[in-house]
């Protein structure tokens, strides 16, 4: 799905080469910031959901799953990329190269599949509210999470058979080489990027249409209201989707163009654009936790509590929330009728 061409395989030898020293320093700085924010931010997300009953609902199980996908790259592939930058080449051997490439793909495909699952969850919650509690009870939600990750693993395993996980010195990464097989690369981009984004777009368009319809009905009879907080909660996950598309779109479309006609297209793509598209994609893994903190009041308050309690670590695992749902039960679904208010929760 994710990666344009690569310059060669890693067979255990030292592979050198890459951008100039100044550019490499900039890439290292971006990656260090990404790793720090990724680890701290997504740890805050997971702790927030574990600690606060108000955040424990079916929708946020997918948010935690998305955070896990973002954490995967920060704890293994990104540090290896940093090492390659500092050594001006890959020195960790073929096994680490293959594992790094696999985990990178697992994280990216896991992210887009979880974003798709979140969109479907929001769509069912808003547009099919009467059936939401049955569709997204705890048991079903856990099954959906397992299905999401199973599909993710199935999607990435073929890379080993195609031989597409290779080291690319331009980006100091072991990654998916789009030029190995044109048909496979096109399939990967379509199935792992275009189709999920199309599903997400459909779900959010349907939600927007319903919200607009409810607003118009409010103006007509003055009996309904959609709270600003409800709209912000929906917008949080919409912004997560938009940022993912913006960060990963250039890399996918460059890779798709290169795979269709490598000899004609690849020479016309500047190396700086290729490298920039990659590190834009890498940077995306640290953004989601920041978005939750900026746009969702419950997450923001819990972030503050956790940060203030770092002086007393034992308090981190004490549930301080009051009210809300018990355990991980689904919240009551809103009925969107002429006499009911549309509730939109994260």
UniProtKB/Swiss-Prot annotation:
<dbReference type="GO" id="GO:0004930">
    <property type="term" value="F:G protein-coupled receptor activity"/>
</dbReference>
<feature type="topological domain" description="Cytoplasmic">
    <location>
        <begin position="121"/>
        <end position="139"/>
    </location>
</feature>
<dbReference type="GO" id="GO:0045820">
    <property type="term" value="P:negative regulation of glycolytic process"/>
</dbReference>
<comment type="similarity">
    <text>Belongs to the G-protein coupled receptor 1 family.</text>
</comment>
<feature type="compositionally biased region" description="Polar residues">
    <location>
        <begin position="335"/>
        <end position="346"/>
    </location>
</feature>
<feature type="topological domain" description="Extracellular">
    <location>
        <begin position="161"/>
        <end position="184"/>
    </location>
</feature>
<feature type="transmembrane region" description="Helical; Name=1">
    <location>
        <begin position="27"/>
        <end position="47"/>
    </location>
</feature>
<feature type="topological domain" description="Cytoplasmic">
    <location>
        <begin position="48"/>
        <end position="60"/>
    </location>
</feature>
<keyword id="KW-0297">G-protein coupled receptor</keyword>
<dbReference type="GO" id="GO:0007186">
    <property type="term" value="P:G protein-coupled receptor signaling pathway"/>
</dbReference>
<feature type="transmembrane region" description="Helical; Name=2">
    <location>
        <begin position="61"/>
        <end position="81"/>
    </location>
</feature>
<feature type="topological domain" description="Extracellular">
    <location>
        <begin position="1"/>
        <end position="26"/>
    </location>
</feature>
<protein>
    <recommendedName>
        <fullName>Melatonin receptor type 1C</fullName>
    </recommendedName>
</protein>
<feature type="transmembrane region" description="Helical; Name=4">
    <location>
        <begin position="140"/>
        <end position="160"/>
    </location>
</feature>
<feature type="glycosylation site" description="N-linked (GlcNAc...) asparagine">
    <location>
        <position position="7"/>
    </location>
</feature>
<comment type="function">
    <text>High affinity receptor for melatonin. The activity of this receptor is mediated by pertussis toxin sensitive G proteins that inhibits adenylate cyclase activity.</text>
</comment>
<feature type="topological domain" description="Cytoplasmic">
    <location>
        <begin position="293"/>
        <end position="346"/>
    </location>
</feature>
<feature type="topological domain" description="Extracellular">
    <location>
        <begin position="259"/>
        <end position="271"/>
    </location>
</feature>
<dbReference type="InterPro" id="IPR017452">
    <property type="entry name" value="GPCR_Rhodpsn_7TM"/>
</dbReference>
<keyword id="KW-1003">Cell membrane</keyword>
<feature type="transmembrane region" description="Helical; Name=3">
    <location>
        <begin position="100"/>
        <end position="120"/>
    </location>
</feature>
<dbReference type="GO" id="GO:0005886">
    <property type="term" value="C:plasma membrane"/>
</dbReference>
<feature type="transmembrane region" description="Helical; Name=5">
    <location>
        <begin position="185"/>
        <end position="205"/>
    </location>
</feature>
<dbReference type="GO" id="GO:0005654">
    <property type="term" value="C:nucleoplasm"/>
</dbReference>
<dbReference type="GO" id="GO:1904408">
    <property type="term" value="F:melatonin binding"/>
</dbReference>
<feature type="region of interest" description="Disordered">
    <location>
        <begin position="326"/>
        <end position="346"/>
    </location>
</feature>
<feature type="disulfide bond">
    <location>
        <begin position="97"/>
        <end position="174"/>
    </location>
</feature>
<dbReference type="GO" id="GO:0008502">
    <property type="term" value="F:melatonin receptor activity"/>
</dbReference>
<keyword id="KW-0325">Glycoprotein</keyword>
<keyword id="KW-1133">Transmembrane helix</keyword>
<dbReference type="GO" id="GO:0046325">
    <property type="term" value="P:negative regulation of D-glucose import"/>
</dbReference>
<keyword id="KW-0675">Receptor</keyword>
<feature type="transmembrane region" description="Helical; Name=7">
    <location>
        <begin position="272"/>
        <end position="292"/>
    </location>
</feature>
<dbReference type="Pfam" id="PF00001">
    <property type="entry name" value="7tm_1"/>
</dbReference>
<keyword id="KW-1015">Disulfide bond</keyword>
<dbReference type="InterPro" id="IPR000276">
    <property type="entry name" value="GPCR_Rhodpsn"/>
</dbReference>
<feature type="topological domain" description="Cytoplasmic">
    <location>
        <begin position="206"/>
        <end position="237"/>
    </location>
</feature>
<keyword id="KW-0807">Transducer</keyword>
<keyword id="KW-0472">Membrane</keyword>
<feature type="topological domain" description="Extracellular">
    <location>
        <begin position="82"/>
        <end position="99"/>
    </location>
</feature>
<dbReference type="InterPro" id="IPR000025">
    <property type="entry name" value="Melatonin_rcpt"/>
</dbReference>
<keyword id="KW-0812">Transmembrane</keyword>
